């Protein structure tokens, strides 16, 4: 009805309903975010870092050392692992029986601060080097890098060659592989950019992890069946809520192409002991045997092992990795 009869037009019912739906969604989204911030603050207060929080360029980086052996091993995590110190626990347990083992959580990982770091290999290597010295961890170091930390390890060995005693790759990223020739964009797919990342930023990671079951294996495969305790898995879930896809992780994924270019021409010193564990599924999908052989290098102190495991080789092959590393360093320590 028009205004000639003296009555105002009635609002359409669908507009009212749409307005109610939008209002409910806004309140729900805001409530989830507020709850996430409050719970994270409480959890951080109740669960302090198990290791040292050392100063690196005005920010705190988490460094956790276990064991007292003569060999000093430094563990570095793969891309987007929210809780590296906890993720490496079964491997640390094996290695610390004969070595001094240090897990360094880069910025934006675990208990370390979120910063504006470039997250390129040379900058991460510099920060790791600073953190190790600040924590009083003595070298030379056997660098043990998972996945993208293979790039960090290459940069570290290139920048601080006198402080590196060996390298063990855990299904590492091989930058000179043809697989990366066209990798100029981010490491994550568009679904992540358009859907998953906004959900995480809005605090919905807690909703997702609430449905992941007793083991937080929906993304990273950590399981009680592989030697993780219930307490460890609960803490992994908690830190996933805190740190999943932090600004640093987002940046590290975004600059993958630049990181590949920065390390493509690097090779380990010919005298450096090198041991590389490659998951069979990774080899089949991304690398040729020749590319792996070039990465590892030749010689009695250069060893390559293909394992029937997931990309997270240390979840199931921790005993084998520990034994192989010990044998390598016993024979080839320089």
Task: List each language-model region with its residue ranges.
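Conserved hydrolase catalytic core segment
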Residues: 139-184
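A catalytic-pocket lid/entrance helix-loop region that shapes and gates access to the active site
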Residues: 170-210
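Active-site loop/oxyanion-hole signature of alpha/beta-hydrolase fold enzymes
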Residues: 66, 106-144
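Alpha/beta-hydrolase fold catalytic core
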Residues: 1-73, 96-99, 293, 301, ...
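Conserved serine/cysteine hydrolase catalytic core
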Residues: 228-298
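Conserved HGGG/HGGXW glycine-rich cap/lid loop of the alpha/beta-hydrolase fold
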Residues: 59, 65-111
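Conserved catalytic-core motifs of eukaryotic protein kinase domains, centered on the activation segment
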Residues: 85-87, 112-118, 179-180
């Amino acid at each position: 009805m028009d205004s000639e009869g003296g009555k105002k037009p009635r609002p359409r019912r669908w507009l009212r309903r749409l307005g109610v739906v939008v209002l409910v969604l806004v309140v729900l989204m805001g409530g989830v975010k507020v709850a996430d911030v409050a719970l994270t603050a409480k959890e951080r207060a109740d669960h302090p870092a198990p290791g040292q929080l050392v100063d690196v360029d005005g920010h705190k980086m988490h460094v956790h050392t276990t064991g007292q052996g003569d060999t000093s091993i430094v563990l570095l995590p793969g891309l987007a692992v929210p809780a590296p110190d906890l993720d490496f626990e079964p491997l640390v347990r094996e290695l610390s029986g004969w070595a001094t083992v240090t897990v360094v959580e880069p910025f934006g990982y675990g208990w370390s601060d979120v910063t504006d770091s470039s997250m390129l290999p040379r900058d991460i290597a510099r920060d790791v080097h600073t953190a190790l010295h600040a924590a009083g961890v003595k070298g030379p170091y056997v660098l043990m890098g998972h996945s993208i930390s293979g790039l960090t390890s290459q940069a570290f060995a290139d920048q601080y060659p006198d402080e590196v005693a060996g390298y063990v790759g855990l299904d590492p990223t091989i930058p000179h592989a043809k697989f990366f020739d066209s990798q100029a964009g981010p490491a994550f797919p568009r679904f992540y950019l358009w859907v998953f990342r906004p959900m995480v930023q809005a605090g919905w990671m807690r909703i997702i992890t609430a449905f992941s079951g007793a083991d937080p294996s929906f993304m990273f495969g950590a399981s009680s069946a592989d030697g993780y305790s219930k307490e460890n898995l609960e803490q992994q879930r908690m830190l996933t809520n805190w740190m999943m896809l932090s600004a640093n992780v987002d940046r590290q994924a975004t600059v993958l192409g630049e990181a590949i270019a920065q390390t493509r021409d690097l090779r380990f010193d010919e005298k450096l002991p090198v041991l590389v564990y490659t998951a069979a599924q990774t080899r089949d999908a991304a690398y040729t045997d020749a590319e792996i052989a070039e990465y590892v290098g030749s010689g009695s102190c250069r060893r390559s092992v293909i394992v029937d495991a997931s990309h997270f080789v240390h979840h199931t092959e921790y005993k084998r990795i520990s034994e192989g590393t010990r044998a390598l360093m016993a024979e080839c320590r320089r």
